[in-house]
Structure formats: C-alpha cells, structure tokens
C-alpha cells in the first residue's frame, strides 16, 4: 500500500464548534497517552487483519482507499500494507503517543478519533474501514459506527474485530462468579478476573449483540468468524483453536460487513 492524501471533510456539521469533552473522555485520553498503556497490535492480530483486508480487496482493479481507525503503534497497519501492495492506506488514532511510534514505520497517519467530532474525511471516500479491536474501547459506539458508515462508499467494507464476552472460557468463569476475561471495571487496576493488564475495555459484545448493533446501523451481508486469543495458556490453545469453528464461543469475533 502507499500513502495518499484524503479529501477534506464535507459531511454535515463540518466546521461546527467541537463539543466540550466530558470528564470520562479526558480520563480516557490520559489513559491512552500514558506510555505504559499497551498500544501494540501483536503478531496474531496483525496477520489476522492483513488476511481480512486481502479478502475484502479481492476484485478491486484500481487502488482502494483503506482507513485503519485505531491503528495504535501501526504494527498491524504496516503488515497489512506490505501484504496488500498497490492500495492506499491511512492510519488514524487519537493517541499522539501511539502515532509517534507508528511514524517510524513510514505510514500515512492522521490524529483523529471515530467518535464525535469524527474523522476529518469526506463522506463516501473509503472503500474499506478497519476497526481492529477498537469498538470495545469507545464511549459512544453508536456515533462510531455512524461515522464509519458515513465515510464508506456504497457497498464498502467494514472489517471489525473485538474480544468475545461469550468466549468458551468466559461462560465457565461467569458460572463460577468470576469476572469474564477481557471485561474491566476500572482503568486503574484489574479486579475479579484473570490477568494483570488494564486494556481500557468499556464495552463487551457477544456475537448476537454485535451483529444486531451493526445491522441497526445500516450494515448488511455480515460474515462472522472466530479467532484465537494469544494469551490462552499453552495447554488450552488446541481447544481455543477448535472453538474458532464456532464463532459464538470463539475468543475473538471477526466481522466483515458491507454498507447497505
């Protein structure tokens, strides 16, 4: 992929005064600007995104415009670019710290978030929007999906991945009164669940909830698949891989949807 300049935003409301941040958004900004907050994509997620993008780009005879929203440190974006050469990729993230890391990879980058006031991108500009393990971090998922749909061309693809609240091990943990993996009750520490790292997850989804939300926001032709989670203990990894065949209980939900 190669970098490309994006057209200026022409959506309704462009140029209007930005609304003032609410206190929770300020706290989230501080959380994501902290160098200790994880922004790395990890090799599994990077390869997964590259494969999803390759499938979405099949049949394009001209260079497609791809927006990777929530690109983090750019590692996954860079791999996707290398494996899908000839298309235009732009990485977007609201964290200046994450973008400082991503710039070392020579990517085209924009500091912006998918929540209000939205992306500095004209309506119906993008062929593909990637939201790889992003939606669980957002305060306003409705506005984010509205914005993704706004910038997509008719029939354009939304590629989305997110941890599964109903993963096979979470079903057992919840039955035992243990907080499910991936879910969080605080940005300051981990309480009541396995693990020690705070990731900033604000929303969690089952397959049914996620597909219902996407359909309500004007996306159709939903294709859902499952993926494994890299932190599953070694002895349980074959089981985690097997559950990928049953997306409703897989560790990670992968969705390819199209703008209706």
Predicted segment positions?
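A short SAM/SAH-binding and catalytic strip from SAM-dependent methyltransferases
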Residues: 128-139
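Conserved class I S-adenosyl-L-methionine
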Residues: 63-72
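Class I SAM-dependent methyltransferase SAM/SAH-binding core
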Residues: 74-117
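A short acidic, Gly/Pro-enriched loop at the edge of an enzyme's catalytic core
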Residues: 117-128
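S-adenosyl-L-methionine-dependent methyltransferase catalytic module, highlighting the catalytic core
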Residues: 19-48, 75, 94, 101, ...
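N-terminal auxiliary segments of SAM/dcSAM-dependent transferases
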Residues: 2-18
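Conserved alpha-helix/loop element of class I SAM-dependent methyltransferases that forms part
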Residues: 44-62
